[in-house]
Amino acid sequence: MRRVNILCSFALLFASHTSLAVTYPLPPEGSRLVGQSFTVTVPDHNTQPLETFAAQYGQGLSNMLEANPGADVFLPKSGSQLTIPQQLILPDTVRKGIVVNVAEMRLYYYPPDSNTVEVFPIGIGQAGRETPRNWVTTVERKQEAPTWTPTPNTRREYAKRGESLPAFVPAGPDNPMGLYAIYIGRLYAIHGTNANFGIGLRVSQGCIRLRNDDIKYLFDNVPVGTRVQIIDQPVKYTTEPDGSNWLEVHEPLSRNRAEYESDRKVPLPVTPSLRAFINGQEVDVNRANAALQRRSGMPVQISSGSRQMF
């Protein structure tokens, strides 16, 4: 996980970019596979960082890095191909309200009576200040132009880095919560940012961070009382109505500081149901194992006889 950690040090070099949700029609009953990934060509004489392309196509930096290993974060090579990972497997949970999957750093919003799902990239809590997992709560209130009162512990952490943090940060362009906040539970919020470098990274104090256009959309459209569920599913899988089997694997979140700072891959959680799925008669075990090793963050067809490349 060290690569993402290092990126945070340089992220303020990036320009600020807006984003828009990727909206998908809900699939028919029994299906969880939506969307389609595609590639784009980096323009000649490119001067833009990877964040520009991520924002343009509604992705976070982690999504782009998983799909494009080896891509230059600061200046993707002109003429190179970038995969935009817009195909995904919906999380294995109720399709209602807001669902946040911290492992893939995406927020899913199911607007009532719309038969669609809107997907937003997010930033989450840094190691040691994790965003809660396996939690169901509701939107308690919303606040335009929020203020921020850092906890004493947060101020101490900043002081250790040689940064002075005031006891109170008023609303405005210097507030790291951005211009809108949706408060969930009593201690956490879904909010904007004063710098888009955190989208797709673990950089917050535990809250959920979105690009500014995205949080404004949610602020305007998500009512108080909406159900919010936070899950941690680095591995998603589905057998579709046509019998095809798909596996989507993300880098799991590190469980402690040592894992976070290590170059080694964090072990994947292999549940009995996942093991049974992989060992099914219609699954190519070799392809499944390759997907578990590659961790591309994109659905891979692992049906026996499938010729999909990844």
UniProtKB/Swiss-Prot annotation:
Active site: 191 (proton donor/acceptor), 207 (nucleophile)
Signal sequence, start to end: 1-21
Keyword Cell wall biogenesis/degradation: yes
Pathway recorded for this protein: Cell wall biogenesis; peptidoglycan biosynthesis
GO cellular component: periplasmic space
GO biological process: cell wall organization; peptidoglycan-protein cross-linking; regulation of cell shape
Domain of life: Bacteria
Reported consequences of knocking out the gene: Simultaneous disruption of erfK, ybiS, ycfS and ynhG leads to loss of covalent anchoring of the major outer membrane lipoprotein (Lpp, also known as the Braun lipoprotein) to the peptidoglycan. Complementation with erfK restores some of this anchoring.
Localization per Swiss-Prot or TrEMBL: Periplasm
GO MF term list: glycosyltransferase activity; peptidoglycan L,D-transpeptidase activity
Database matches in InterPro entries: LD-transpeptidase (IPR050979), LD_TPept_cat_dom (IPR005490), Ldt_C (IPR041597), Transpep_catalytic_dom (IPR038063)
Domain L,D-TPase catalytic: 96-231
Function: Responsible, at least in part, for anchoring of the major outer membrane lipoprotein (Lpp, also known as the Braun lipoprotein) to the peptidoglycan via a meso-diaminopimelyl-L-Lys- bond on the terminal residue of Lpp.
Record-given protein name: Probable L,D-transpeptidase ErfK/SrfK
Organism this protein belongs to: Escherichia coli (strain K12)
Gene of this entry: erfK
